Amino acid sequence: MAKAVTSSKGAEKSEKKKPAARSGVKKDASKSKDASKSQVNVKISSAPARSAAKDTPVKKEERAKGTVGEIKQVIGAVVDVQFEGALPNILNALETENLGNRLVLEVAQHLGENTVRTIAMDTTDGLMRGQKVVDTGAQISVPVGEATLGRIMNVIGEPVDNVGPIASTKTRSIHQEAPEYVEQSTVSEILVTGIKVVDLLAPYSKGGKIGLFGGAGVGKTVLIMELINNIAKAHGGYSVFAGVGERTREGNDLYYEMIESGVNVNPKENNGSTEGSKCALVYGQMNEPPGARARVALSGLTIAESFRDEGQDVLFFVDNIFRFTQAGAEVSALLGRIPSAVGYQPTLATDMGALQERITSTKIGSITSVQAIYVPADDLTDPAPATSFAHLDATTVLSRSIAEKGIYPAVDPLDSFSRMLDPLIVGEEHYTVACQVQTILQRYRALQDIIAILGMDELSEDDKLLVGRARKIERFLSQPFHVAEAFTGSPGKLVSLEDTIKGFKGLCAGDYDDLPEAAFYMVGSIDEALEKGKRLMAEAS
């Protein structure tokens, strides 16, 4: 702006000099002085008008709103757009039309020559050079609030479930700052899930991050749905599921399983309404461009943050957090950044930190995140999972060997851990009982080779007693789920933390050594196990 003013002054000076040089007529000195004074007066009087216009406050988000640019280059998911006027801000959303559909581009870099480099949130097939692009003047925003529950949307908040538009009056930018220190809650509090094995041995923290490790067919989806169901019943909270790089088939299955289990309401059977649903779903499928997969976790988190700020305890699921990193690496390569270790983006830790630090408790509500984590080639030192581990408060490991025994949930009680399992947080009784359970199960695991080779008869009396208790504990860690009632025929059980501690404390102390093992399989509280045991003993006699 300063340069423009200077050049205009220079032009005016040259205009003053040029007429005298061209005419060759000598003017009266006094007249020329008066003329120059009048010119100076004109310039002085007009200067405030220019400065006033310059000092008029312009909102940052409206600085380039409505500016139209045109596409200069398309390379895969990267689109370069040139503007004549003001450039859009970094992270601004640009819009254009592609094959009759709305295409959103997010500004990633300013390249110079009035050109910005953007990342497309959908396919760029069909785009042409010279095509017009409009700056929205704002970042990508998604609908938030209860209207999103029971619905599936994409990264830019558009519904993809063929049930009509989302009836939300509120939207929110997907790029938010993490809560300030003064806003965050410093109280370490357990989020009781009603699932015995989780609450006893690897309790979740309100506002914590939990890594969920599990292969195919070990009950990961069922565990996720039960957590969603129990949080809604016990805490009245909502859940958000972000499918990052999800297989379309898996996402489709999850949606219908949630309807069948009662977690969500089928809008097609409820006059288009999803009232009563407990979970919002945001999908960026495996076949979508890296821009969508890199941003869909932020879209889901934004919805979760909205519920948290209304005072809710929210569950936020991400499947799979590795694919968030993978998409970030693709975007980074397309933008021309030099890769770091193993080909990942140089901003890996920054990108992960920006996401994870937003998942926290405030004095109003909490977001508890359960993140499925894929470990490439089972290498825990790979930068992607290693960066994720730094943020986790607990891990829940699902074991195939436990699932093969028919014990569900198939959570490994020895491989799962939580920083919340501390006597200062959970209390002395809870901590002591959990340690006793783990000690008995660890000793049982060590004895299994001897049992397999020599049989139970070769064990000492103490070891025989310990093995019997361990097998009962193992079975008591199983639990019927509400969301699996249709398959098991058994009503689901939500077990309080007090009942869980009471039951395992008695098992470790040998109070139930006289009951058969079958009495502890697929029951809720210890009182149910006692009733079942008496019934089994009566039938046997």
UniProtKB/Swiss-Prot annotation:
InterPro entries: AAA+_ATPase, ATP-synt_VA_C, ATP_synth_F1_bsu, ATPase_a/bsu_AS, ATPase_alpha/beta_chains, ATPase_F1/V1/A1_a/bsu_N, ATPase_F1/V1/A1_a/bsu_N_sf, ATPase_F1/V1/A1_a/bsu_nucl-bd. It catalyses: ATP + H2O + 4 H(+)(in) = ADP + phosphate + 5 H(+)(out). Its EC number is 7.1.2.2. The keyword Zinc does not apply. Produces ATP from ADP in the presence of a proton gradient across the membrane. The catalytic sites are hosted primarily by the beta subunits. F-type ATPases have 2 components, CF(1) - the catalytic core - and CF(0) - the membrane proton channel. CF(1) has five subunits: alpha(3), beta(3), gamma(1), delta(1), epsilon(1). CF(0) has three main subunits: a(1), b(2) and c(9-12). The alpha and beta chains form an alternating ring which encloses part of the gamma chain. CF(1) is attached to CF(0) by a central stalk formed by the gamma and epsilon chains, while a peripheral stalk is formed by the delta and b chains. This is ATP synthase subunit beta. It comes from Bartonella tribocorum (strain CIP 105476 / IBS 506). The gene is atpD.
